[in-house]
Amino acid sequence: MKRLLFLLLFALAPAAFAATPPVALFYMTSNPNSIRDFFAHSSQIDLLVPTWYSVDQNGLVTGEPEPAVLSRAQEEKIPVMPIVALFNKKAFHQLATSAEAQARMNEALVRACRLHGYTGFQFDLENVDYLDRDNLSALVKTTADALHAAGLQLSIATVPNAPGYPGADGFAKWIYTDWRGAYDLAALAKSADLICLMTYDQNTRWTTPGPVAGWQWTLDNMNYALQFVPKEKLSLGIPLYGYHWYTGAPIVTPATIPDAAPTEKPNPTADYISYPDAMQLAHDWDGKLQWDADDRSAWFYFYRDQEREWVFFTDLHTFQDRYQLAQQNGLEGFCSWVLGEEDPAIWNFLPRHGQASAGR
């Protein structure tokens, strides 16, 4: 009987381990909807990453916490790891090539952590030129060393960059040189405590209509990242929002030659849209909600002014599939942009914090 019980427990152990909830990291902005969402669902958030800080080319860190948010997080023992952001190519290059500016930044980050009780900071450094790849890795190491010396942590949000090289067309080259090519995942993983892989924005205003994070695209980028990043350091990005594509007014450029006709170009465009706003749009225009089984994404279309408009968005089903992907692959967790934009049904699915795999 004892032997049978032992064998049964042994057989169930892998399933129990696989079922361990991934760490739930949520981003929060200063938008009132985002803040209200945090207060409503703080018991299901394992790590809060608010967009409170930025840094400039001189290493000047600016920002401050939302007092009520910080107080609630401390009451519930939710680690707070604010973003420190920089999205400017030239400014980043100046910061990354100045030891003085980096020292100023790192001193400010450590000071803010000690003053407010943060567990550390998360770098959100985007629009970085691919030629600054080594500079980015070196900057992250310098900051990680400074924070680690103070008993703090550093994470970094990275643009997904599979397959690791540019494609053939002009857009593929641009997205690599201006967005994807700067992130050396192997080097970053050696320095940072956590890599938040931003597996979203596959399709945006720059592209034709499509899922925010298609299934195969998400798999490709996760598997590529796992070649360089230990799974216990990787958090999978899950978007909570969508995009609404429609036809904009043609762009008319006046002729530079006398008597010549102006140049006209088409202007398809897309707007960022939250789940509640997407549902309102579907209701108002009789959009038929659909499920893309290949991309595992929710979407719909409708007609306005005799033209078709598309919306791809994240519903509970879309969220669950990606959550389970992180769980089944034993990743550290998932990171979702952004509180206040989501399908409220996800809160009926997510466990309370403290049940995730990481110690609290």
What is each of the regions a protein language model found here?
Residues L48, F123, I195, L236, ...:
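Conserved, mostly hydrophobic/aromatic
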Residues L4-A13:
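Sec-dependent N-terminal signal peptides
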Residues L240-Q324, I346, G354-G359:
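Glycan-binding loop/region signatures in secreted carbohydrate-active enzymes
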Residues N58, D129-A278:
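Substrate-binding surface in catalytic domains of secreted glycosidases
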Residues A19-A108:
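Glycan-recognition patch characteristic of GH18 chitinases/ENGases
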Residues M28-S42, T97-R114, Y176-L188, F313-Q327:
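Short, acidic/polar
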Residues T318-S336, E341-E342:
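Conserved, well-ordered alpha-helix/loop/beta-strand core segments that scaffold catalytic motifs
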Residues Y27, W52, P82-L86, L125-N127, ...:
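A cross-domain feature marking catalytic cores of carbohydrate-active enzymes
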